[in-house]
């Protein structure tokens, strides 16, 4: 069945090609085609044959044609052939040539009044460029432009805007007229786009080989980055060869996104381009709407078109070029025009015109024929063919095809949108079924371990590592929704990445730049420097700079009570107590006070010290001081003690109720102002680059960052900076160091610190964010960003955050000291020193008491001789009695022992008065201590003694063997001591009849009377 049309076509072709113009034929059409467009001639003759077989249009009339082939870039040849056709007599001229030759034919047609239907043809199938102004449609011109104006600039600009491209390269082949995209370049320049141009030589292999031979490695890497986004103004054949070459030489990767724009892209070309390309491919081509009724697709204007041309599934129809379609519709339009002219009986016969003959007149029927053609319109292979007042065809439609995402080269192609001059872009270039198309796609993810974003959850020998963290949870949420899978690995150098001196990038960013990974995931911040080499999704968490510091340690200081004063001050106070005590003693010794009868002076050095100490601690003194010098001294001392004690009390309250913060840093400004506490960050990180840029850039220099940069960059950055964040956190915890890093990371560290010894300080200004990095031009960026926004809108992102940053943390993240249970209560540690001093005093007192008891018992075990005891006790008695005789004002009284009567003494009461015993030393430089007693009865006895009896004492039967003598001096304690001139003789003991007194074993008594 398919053989017959082909045979019929060949028979018709040969018969028309060699058939001369019939003398009785009134319809003659001339045609001039480019010599390389043999297919135009084939379709032209096929259209004439179809119309000659259709009796409904021209009835009995037949169309005859004359075809000439010319060089498309030779205007003189085109004019010469056109004149030859006009000399034969033609009703219309059809041409399918380039703009250069068309301009000459336009002038000739205007001069000869021959309707000229021009079908612009681009050389070698390259995209069309607008013809020069002299070749464009004018209202009074005889040239009609069958093909619509060139709208490629408008279409490609809207596509690029839809893709939000900011940087790309345009490739064009040698046959393309670069002047055709002048308007497009102007539009991109106004939008601030960075567009590069590169001409593709005819020998593509040699061109690529030359680039590899002449470019350095760094230049090739940059060139690969440029190729991620490209627009190709090429013929389908050149585009196939170019794509094949760059893919085989590994100049492009699966993240590339290319746009091929050309009206002349057939269905077969689309399939071949998709098969050869990788990444995402977008194709823009002209399309022709088909009737929705499939049975009417080959019936147009009462004319049945050849099935091989109108059936989209027919291979011959798929191979049709756009110029072929317009040529067929042009013949159909002329046939309908001739039909109307015949019906209106306004037919003008053909005339033989001479272009060379001088004074040749134009065709008289040309104007009428032109108006009839312009008013007509047909629906053919190009949908609707008609002309406006300017003589151009306004009907044009474009379709935008796009490949699915993924690495499978056998993926399909779908229509993403359409475009026309009236409605513009109709549709979206985003594949709505992307989530289904990503199923089966395996992404290679590079990461850097950073708590809590990415952590190793399980590491079993021989099995792949398992990761967890906030960023991993976000990636899993995307994978579950979009259907892709991923393989994850850690960056070899464990760095986020920065640009090196040679222009290359290291770390995680370097893995993306060198195409070793598809996605970069961690606590990765979005910075302008990184955005210049990689693409980022929208931020999934805000970012701010923070500082990690160690809280002030609440150490147990048992002697915190001594903290208000410095050790040197305490030493001065102790020395002052000793000095003042000594001065008080000396002042009293030099000018002793006058004591009343019966008083005992206690102004010893020990008592003076005790008095000064007691007054210092506000406990008062026991010994009265009456001299003016001593009182003056004590008054000044009390004033001194008042000031010292008041100052101590106030400072002690401050020390015990207010925690002294060693590190009072509450903001980045506080950190920058101080220099005592060193601080730093991670080398080659975003924080490092941020501090450096704001601290050194003269256009955005910040004083705070300038101070921080001086500290961070000390000794070239090696002193205060670390290689990874874990090292910085460790330095803070176990040393004097402040770590400047991402606030989110530091908050997680402070929350999970076992002893809650860390706190954070941040600026709370989220000028940046965390995002997922992808290769430049990655097709996954937009859909990832869209899904992240959905997670944020429905609250799922907040749930993931609470998993790693809980609100009910046991640690206070922002307090520089440990929290207390009560704001006013003081703990035992604040007063431990006081209790220790008290305990030490108790122990020391017990020890002294033990020593005293031991010493007393040891002293009592040494029993003295009776002679010594008798002599000393009796002598003491004399002294004590003399001290009671206050009637006589003489300081030196002489007594006679015979005048003293001891009989009235109640000796039974003497043992009860043992508490009145007193240790006195009345004998200087003798080292003899006498033990005596002053019973209450002796005071009564002293009152009965007369001043006259002071000359001597009657002791009854006691014989006085003592040689009397005067006492020359009074002892300081109020008693007497022996004169250094007279030496008292011993008084022998004589028994006196009296009751027996039993003192028991009294160790304090040496003599019994």
From Swiss-Prot:
Location in or out of the cell: Postsynaptic cell membrane
Cysteine pairings via disulfide bonds: none
Keyword field: Calcium, Cell membrane, Glycoprotein, Ion channel, Ion transport, Ligand-gated ion channel, Membrane, Metal-binding, Postsynaptic cell membrane, Receptor, Signal, Synapse, Transmembrane, Transmembrane helix, Transport
Residues the record lists as binding Ca(2+) 1: 531, 534-535
Molecular function GO labels: AMPA glutamate receptor activity; metal ion binding; transmitter-gated monoatomic ion channel activity involved in regulation of postsynaptic membrane potential
Reported tissue expression: Expressed in cerebellar Purkinje cells, in crest cells in the medial octavolateral nucleus and in type I neurons of the optic tectum.
SMART domains recorded: Lig_chan-Glu_bd (SM00918), PBPe (SM00079)
GO biological process: modulation of chemical synaptic transmission; synaptic transmission, glutamatergic
Residues in compartment: Cytoplasmic: 588-635, 852-1009
Binding site for Ca(2+) 2: 753, 755, 757
CDD domains listed in its UniProt record: PBP1_iGluR_delta_2, PBP2_iGluR_delta_2
Membrane side Extracellular: residue ranges: 24-566, 657-830
Transmembrane segments: 567-587, 636-656, 831-851
Pfam family, one: Lig_chan-Glu_bd
Glycosylation sites: 293, 306, 390, 426, 713
Membrane topology: Multi-pass membrane protein
Segments of this protein annotated with the region Disordered: 989-1009
Domain of life: Eukaryota
Reaction(s) the record says it catalyses: Ca(2+)(in) = Ca(2+)(out); Na(+)(in) = Na(+)(out)
Job description of the protein: Member of the ionotropic glutamate receptor family, which plays a crucial role in synaptic organization and signal transduction in the central nervous system. Although it shares structural features with ionotropic glutamate receptors, does not bind glutamate as a primary ligand. Promotes synaptogenesis and mediates the D-Serine-dependent long term depression signals and AMPA receptor endocytosis of cerebellar parallel fiber-Purkinje cell (PF-PC) synapses through the NRX1B-CBLN1-GRID2 triad complex.
Known partners and oligomeric status: Tetramer; dimer of dimers.
Free-text comment on this protein's domains from its UniProt entry: The PDZ-binding motif mediates interaction with GOPC.
Family, per entry: Belongs to the glutamate-gated ion channel (TC 1.A.10.1) family. GRID2 subfamily.
PANTHER family in the record: IONOTROPIC GLUTAMATE RECEPTOR
Name of the molecule in the record: Glutamate receptor ionotropic, delta-2
Native source species: Danio rerio (Zebrafish)
Gene: grid2
